[in-house]
């Protein structure tokens, strides 16, 4: 009887011990699963936040380029210079007018990095451009903007068009506005370097953000220390024609989930 009692007692202890061990293991597994699920949700959320912030950044850029474009596009002196392009003096004066924002500034000049101002006729042929700014552009409107303008309906010809596009592997941002008011005589293009505005993405998300070229070159580095406790979350910012333009990498503080 004593031996049987001991055996039953030992078996009971063993069973409860096994149950306890199994419960601990299941608890650990469940905790790990929910942490991973929470982390996955945070990553997806941050990726979406970065995407929205990128679009908000471009909208703010567009606001400044549109304002500058509309100011120049309604300038009577500039319009008259375009109409008199056969005259050498008028052509030189037109270039001076296009250079003026680079020399004397404009409202919002500290918010964008102006690269070039160009003028096209109604057939989208380049007829003049600022002498100031980059000299590495092709002498034509980007394919994307050309297609958008060419496919517009007649009642849309007075609308401005924006585009993030790639020029010789370098992303640029343009706003194209009609030149001449209600009776356009051409188009005016404001071209800026969007790299200048990429740090604004981190300001919007309120998280550390680094930006890279598509080839992996670091463009902008956040000042926060992200060496410990941060998980990178990547988002690719595409040009208007869906070509990859920038790699935006945000960093999620995973210590908050522990």
Regions found by a protein language model. Give the residues of each.
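Conserved beta-strands of PAS-like sensory domains
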Residues: 128-132, 169-203, 244-257
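Soluble periplasmic/extracytoplasmic beta-strand elements of cell-envelope proteins
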Residues: 116-119, 175
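Beta-strand residues that line the small-molecule/cofactor-binding core
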Residues: 5, 169-171, 229
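Juxtamembrane extracytoplasmic/periplasmic/luminal helical "stalk" adjacent to the first N-terminal
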Residues: 6-15, 19-89, 207
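Extracytoplasmic/periplasmic sensor domains and loops in membrane signaling proteins
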Residues: 86-104, 111-114, 125-165, 191-239
């Amino acid at each position: 009887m004593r031996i049987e009692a001991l055996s039953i007692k030992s078996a009971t202890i063993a069973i409860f011990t096994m149950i306890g061990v199994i419960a601990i293991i299941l608890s650990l597994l469940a905790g790990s699963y929910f942490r991973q699920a929470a982390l996955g949700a945070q990553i997806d959320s941050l990726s979406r936040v970065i995407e929205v912030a990128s679009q908000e950044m471009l909208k703010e850029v567009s606001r400044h380029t549109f304002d500058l474009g509309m100011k120049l596009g309604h300038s009577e002196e500039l319009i008259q210079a375009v109409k008199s392009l056969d005259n050498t003096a008028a052509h030189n004066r037109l270039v001076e007018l296009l250079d003026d924002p680079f020399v004397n500034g404009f409202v919002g000049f500290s918010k964008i990095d102006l690269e070039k101002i160009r003028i096209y006729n109604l057939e989208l042929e380049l007829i003049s451009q600022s002498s100031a700014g980059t000299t590495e552009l092709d002498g034509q409107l980007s394919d994307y903007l050309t297609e958008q303008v060419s496919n517009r309906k007649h009642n849309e010809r007075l609308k401005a068009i924006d585009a993030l596009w790639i020029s010789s592997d370098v992303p640029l941002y343009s706003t194209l506005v009609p030149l001449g008011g209600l009776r356009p005589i051409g188009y005016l293009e404001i071209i800026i370097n969007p790299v200048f505005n990429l740090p604004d993405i981190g300001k919007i998300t309120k998280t550390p953000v680094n930006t890279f070229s598509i080839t992996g070159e670091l463009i902008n580095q956040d000042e926060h220390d992200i060496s410990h406790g941060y998980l990178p979350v990547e988002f690719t910012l595409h040009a208007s024609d869906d070509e990859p333009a920038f790699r935006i990498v945000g960093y999620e503080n995973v210590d908050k989930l522990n």
